[in-house]
Amino acid sequence: MVKIILNSFLFWGGWIIIPFIMEIVPALGSVFLLIRRNLRHKLHKKELEVYPEITLIIPVYNSADTLYGCIRSINDSTYPNDRIRIFLVNNKGKDNSFDIYAQCQQEFPELLMQWMNSEQGKSRALNLALYNSDGKYIINLDSDGMLEKNALVNMITRFENDTAINCMTGSILTVPEQIKKYKAGPSRLLRELEFMEYAQAFLAGRSYASELNSVYTLSGAFSAFRKSAVLKSWMYNTDT
């Protein structure tokens, strides 16, 4: 009887203790490190008096349904519009994305935007825009993404406050307001789980990895680079 109880205790204890050690303890540790990091950054953060010119590169491929929201989010950001230049690089798209671009030119005249056509794939399209850019910093943004209003200011401020940083990636989240449009059920639950997955990956996982200087990949949907560093690299690999 004692042996059965002991075996049961070890079995169920393993199911409780192992996840606690492997998941909960590191999670608590990461929360502590992130709080400490945020406090440290706030204490040493110096607000910018002059905003450097930045270049946003938006690859476009049949993006008519999302492109307007993407460009509007840039226009509505707190970064000065006259310090932003946008390259929209069309990669053999067949829809009316250009019409959306033309509409945005009319509605957001303060934004300097340029449409470029590339017939040789996304990587060559990105390299083409890089070579034609003038900004001190290069930011890649997917055409189905929408910026949080302070995202650009926060990112460039961090760059300017730490010259050792040559690249960084932003947090990618789905939009909670859009999830609420779905009725309760499997479809909405799936999107809620997706939001939690993104939140865990970016707000906790990558932030913790950043604190340990161990981020090994950047999100293609929203990443930024110091142009002087990028031009010393091999640029985007055109074989992929």
Spans of features found by a protein language model:
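Short, acidic, metal-binding catalytic loop of nucleotide-sugar glycosyltransferases
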Residues: 72-83
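Short aromatic/hydrophobic "clamp" motif used to bind/position activated sugar donors
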Residues: 138
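Long helical/loop segments within the catalytic core of UDP-sugar-dependent glycosyltransferases
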Residues: 108, 124-125, 156-239
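Acidic helix N-cap motif at the loop->helix transition within catalytic regions
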Residues: 68, 95-103, 150
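Acidic donor-binding/catalytic loop of UDP-sugar-dependent glycosyltransferases
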Residues: 96, 145-158
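N-terminal membrane-anchoring/stem segments of glycan-assembly enzymes
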Residues: 1-50
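A conserved acidic beta->alpha catalytic loop
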Residues: 90-99, 118-120
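Cell-envelope/extracellular polymer assembly enzymes that use nucleotide-activated donors
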Residues: 52-55, 85
